[in-house]
Amino acid sequence: MDIGLREWLIVIGLIVIAGILFDGWRRMRGGKGKLKFKLDRSFANLPDDDGDSAELLGPARVVEHREPSFDEQDLPSVSAREAKERKGGKRQEEPRQGDLDLDEGLALEADPSDAAETVEPRKGKSKGRKEKEREKAPAVAAEPAPVDEVLIINVIARDESGFKGPALLQNILESGLRFGDMDIFHRHESMAGNGEILFSMANAVKPGTFDLDDIDNFSTRAVSFFLGLPGPRHPKQAFDVMVAAARKLAHELNGELKDEQRSVLTAQTIEHYRQRIIDHERRSLMQKR
């Protein structure tokens, strides 16, 4: 029996659909688990100004001769613990930087002190601007839930000098991030730093923290925004706020957006992140039944 053109098209279509479904299943399986920030010990093709090589997190894709390279081997693997029952509230479209109007009567279930193990706490902290910033952060004490997966957006400076401390601080403060636990920045429900934590931003260079007392002399080649799942009460809206903050930083400080694999962050990648959030919410609902 001869097979016509129509039958061949049907067979080819079924094969393509099966391939798409398998690729989506593989990506979801590969995206689960704990966040691993990789701290590198060297940059490729960068001048050695002071004898100390910069150290960036994770493997890098070299897109030009000034782009940093990342070694997978001698790098410590650190797990993210940004696990909080948090509240968020924004629509699916690009959010504005402002307070999130969420239910105020719900109990907070987060522990900012366990926000991320990607950074190393500093010893002998001084009482300068750090103390003032920390007074703005709410004190929350609750047992964190395990993190299933973490959504990461990296912003890498295009300039060799990196992001300068004062300009970086001004930019992220305008986006509502506030300095807090683990010596990193957190975005709360309110722009004033009140309410539940939606996402956080860590320094992508060792030790992964920020020193506000020496911010005038501070610079870094990259920062990492991250949001843990399970986490905010409204993770899709919180993710949109995180995307807006990362885009603002990249646009105003001449940075480049990268995903968790150090590939260029495209609109398709952002939609894939949103789909991961939807899939995680669906799995959580099924487990509760």
Curated annotation (Swiss-Prot):
Bilayer topology annotation: Single-pass type I membrane protein
Lineage: Bacteria, Pseudomonadati, Pseudomonadota, Gammaproteobacteria, Pseudomonadales
GO CC terms of this entry: cell division site; plasma membrane
Main location: membrane
Keywords: Cell cycle, Cell division, Cell inner membrane, Cell membrane, Membrane, Transmembrane, Transmembrane helix
Subcellular location: Cell inner membrane
Top-level taxon of origin: Bacteria
Main function: Essential cell division protein that stabilizes the FtsZ protofilaments by cross-linking them and that serves as a cytoplasmic membrane anchor for the Z ring. Also required for the recruitment to the septal ring of downstream cell division proteins.
Protein's UniProt name: Cell division protein ZipA
Residue ranges annotated as Periplasmic topological domain: 1
Family from the record: Belongs to the ZipA family.
Assembly description: Interacts with FtsZ via their C-terminal domains.
Gene that encodes it: zipA
Source species: Pseudomonas aeruginosa (strain ATCC 15692 / DSM 22644 / CIP 104116 / JCM 14847 / LMG 12228 / 1C / PRS 101 / PAO1)
UniProt cross-references to SMART domains, sorted A to Z: ZipA_C (SM00771)
One BP annotation, GO: FtsZ-dependent cytokinesis
Basic and acidic residues: compositionally biased ranges: 81-99
Keyword flag Glycoprotein: no
Cytoplasmic side: 23-289
Region of interest (Disordered), ranges: 66-141
Compositionally skewed regions (Acidic residues) per UniProt: 100-114
Positions of transmembrane segments: 2-22
